[in-house]
Amino acid sequence: QEGCEYVEPLFAALARVKTPMGTFGVMGNNDYERCHDEIIRTMKHYGMRPLEHEVDTLRKDGQQIILAGVRNPFDLTHNGVSPTLALSPKDFVILLVHTPDYIEDVSVANTDLALAGHTHGGQVRVFGVAPVLNSHYGNRFLTGLAYNTAKIPLIITNGIGTSQLPIRIGAPTEVVMITLHRLAE
């Protein structure tokens, strides 16, 4: 597809990152508009698992974490029911969703942690505030750790891309590594 030249080199680079339990992902709004099929094909080629309104289970030493991914979170007509609703509240569930707004706009019950991007950290920030932000909730879901009204924690990353113009000021690119630790009982 035209405009998708970045797909192969991006996923080839991501494939070099060693992930002992696998690599999973969800699509962004621009991915749906342009390169969806090529991204899915390339992810699978490199052994990565796209989660489009699907769940997968990571198991280790008798423990499990459930990953749930949201297909195009901007199409609430078709995707307005979170895949987490069918899961047990006893499980530890991580929700992968492109836009942070989804966890406020849709019930994401049974979610213990949500991971999102989309905002690019504001892309241009002045004194920590983004004058233009592609979230209905403004700077509340700009970057870092936030919570929805149900008190579900959400980590929003700046990511590595840009939108509209290829510029970033005060909102550096980032790839975030999250380490989970079991709480002492």
Language model feature labels by segment:
Residues 3-7, 95-96, 135-136:
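A conditional alpha-helix N-cap/helix-loop micro-motif detector
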Residues 59-61, 149-150:
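Short strand-coil-strand connectors
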Residues 8, 52, 77-82, 132-140:
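N-terminal post-signal-peptidase region of extra-cytosolic proteins
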